[in-house]
Regions:
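Residue-level signal for the start and early helices of compact helical domains
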Residues: 5-8, 30, 47-53, 131-133, ...
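Phosphate-binding site of ATP-dependent enzymes
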Residues: 111-147
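A conserved helix-loop-beta module that forms one wall/lid of the active-site cleft
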Residues: 21-96, 105-126
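Conserved oxyanion/phosphate-binding beta-strand-loop segments in alpha/beta enzyme cores
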Residues: 1-18
């Protein structure tokens, strides 16, 4: 199989922006820097969007501290599918998509099976800042999976 590459010129003709162009010519130009904290935090963004009636996946619950992780089985008891993610993650890192459940196993979008201990570990890593910019502590967002 051979790869077919499109030139930068062709991408521009199709209206594609490079990251630098996007950031400098659009994001920086049309957005006040003082508002960045509202959109750099997925939980704040979600709550703000809901306040203005923007449709969003339902928020199941939020985990803010390590000790809360021990209670997740009760919170997930009726959840066969959900998305678990860091509030301040970047580039899609740290997102766990659960598409189903069989017995005590949760089924990831990849088809892999994980247990509640794996989910707890993932949450702990998020809280510790493993996926956030600069390694700052974070919160875990658990929301509805939309198909």
């Amino acid at each position: 199989m051979t790869a077919h590459w499109i030139s930068v010129r062709q991408l521009r003709q199709f209206g594609m922006l490079g990251m630098n162009c996007r950031n400098v010519d659009f994001i920086n130009r049309y957005n006040r820097r003082s508002l960045y904290p509202l959109v750099d935090d997925k939980l704040k963004t979600k709550l703000l969007a809901q306040e203005y009636g923007v449709p969003m996946p339902g928020l199941q619950f939020v985990v803010r501290e390590q000790h809360e992780i021990s209670h997740i089985e009760r919170q997930l008891v009726n959840s066969d599918s959900f998305v678990l993610k860091p509030s301040k993650g970047s580039g899609g890192k740290g997102i766990l998509v659960v598409i189903g459940r069989e017995g005590d196993d949760y089924i990831k979008s990849s088809g892999a099976r994980i247990g509640v201990a794996d989910i707890r570990r993932h949450m702990s890593n998020i809280l510790a800042g493993l996926y956030s910019l600069g390694g700052a502590s974070d919160v875990v967002i658990i929301e509805d999976l939309i198909a």
